[in-house]
From Swiss-Prot:
HAMAP family, A to Z: Ribosomal_bL12
Listed Pfam families: Ribosomal_L12, Ribosomal_L12_N
GO cellular component terms attached to this protein's record: cytosolic large ribosomal subunit
A Gene Ontology biological process term: translation
SUPFAM superfamilies: ClpS-like, Ribosomal protein L7/12, oligomerisation (N-terminal) domain
Record text on subunit structure and interactions: Homodimer. Part of the ribosomal stalk of the 50S ribosomal subunit. Forms a multimeric L10(L12)X complex, where L10 forms an elongated spine to which 2 to 4 L12 dimers bind in a sequential fashion. Binds GTP-bound translation factors.
Organism this protein belongs to: Streptococcus sanguinis (strain SK36)
UniProt cross-references to CDD domains, sorted A to Z: Ribosomal_L7_L12 (cd00387)
Function as written in the Swiss-Prot or TrEMBL entry: Forms part of the ribosomal stalk which helps the ribosome interact with GTP-bound translation factors. Is thus essential for accurate translation.
InterPro entries: Ribosomal_bL12, Ribosomal_bL12_C, Ribosomal_bL12_C/ClpS-like, Ribosomal_bL12_oligo, Ribosomal_bL12_oligo_N_sf
Protein name: Large ribosomal subunit protein bL12
MF annotations from Gene Ontology: mRNA binding; structural constituent of ribosome
Family recorded in the similarity comment: Belongs to the bacterial ribosomal protein bL12 family.
Length: 122
């Protein structure tokens, strides 16, 4: 019985969430890869004034005491999975989102700070 892509996809469609999670972990271990989306780190600005900027990078500098709430907000902002969002929060300081318009950046900063995080706009 030869395995082909259609058979593999059919098996994946029938698998439960727990089985799929185990599959992802096994693939990560077997091939030494990660399913996390890459997060680019912003380069330091060259003396630009914040008022003159029209887009900002949102940097999580610390998660604070309410880490679970911060992880939820990070997931909402980035669309990352739970594991990836937790790794991002645990690895602070990290850039959460890049190239955000000024108004949206302030809104997201307020949302993160309300959840208990320390945030800077770059």
């Amino acid at each position: 019985m030869a395995l082909n892509i259609e058979n593999i996809i059919a098996e994946i469609k029938e698998a439960s969430i727990l089985e799929l999670n185990d599959l992802v972990k096994a693939i990560e271990e077997e091939f030494g890869v990660t399913a996390a989306a890459p997060v680019a780190v912003a380069a330091a600005g060259a003396g630009e004034a914040a008022a003159a900027k029209d887009s900002f990078d949102i940097e999580l500098t610390a998660a604070g005491d309410k880490k679970v709430g911060v992880i939820k907000v990070v997931r909402e902002i980035t669309g990352l999975g739970l594991k990836e969002a937790k790794e991002l929060v645990d690895g602070a300081p990290n850039v959460i989102k890049e190239g955000v318009a000024a108004a949206e950046a302030e809104e997201l900063k307020a949302k993160l700070e309300e959840a208990g995080a320390s945030v800077t706009l770059k």
